[in-house]
Amino acid sequence: MVLLKISSLLAVLGLLVCQMYSSQAAPARRALEPLPDRVTEAHRLLRALIRELTAEDMEASSSGAAHKRSCDTSTCATQRLADFLSRSGGIGSPDFVPTDVSANSFGRRRRSLHV
């Protein structure tokens, strides 16, 4: 999404620069119009584009649809287990099956005593 916005902004900037060079080669406006006015007009156009892009970002970030992040760390696994226990009725529930969660259950290498 950000890449699309950046590429569109660069395309608009490129078109703006090309338009500025072509207007100096064959002016479509009055020749008496001062050059700084054209530059300020370009600045106004860029400011309006940037405001529009930031408004779209704010609108997208404030929308109700939040994206759920996935993580595989032990903290997230513990949090998912706690959520499951709270939804299922906890340890006092008749459907509760205790699991073996010890230091040797998973994630550790077994050390060989043979050297």
Swiss-Prot record:
Keyword Cytoplasm belongs to the record: no
Disulfide bonds: 71-76
Molecular-function annotations in GO: calcitonin receptor binding; hormone activity
Keyword Plastid belongs to the record: no
Subcellular location as annotated: Secreted
UniProt xrefs under SMART domains: CALCITONIN
Superkingdom as given in the UniProt entry: Eukaryota
Propeptide: 26-69, 107-115
Positions bearing Phenylalanine amide: 106
Tissue expression per record: Skin, intestine and brain.
Signal peptide residues on this chain, from the entry's feature table: 1-25
Any single Pfam family the record assigns to this protein: Calc_CGRP_IAPP
Keyword tags: Amidation, Cleavage on pair of basic residues, Disulfide bond, Hormone, Secreted, Signal
One GO BP annotation of this record: adenylate cyclase-activating G protein-coupled receptor signaling pathway
GO CC field: extracellular space
Entry's family note: Belongs to the calcitonin family.
The protein's name in its UniProt record: Skin calcitonin gene-related peptide
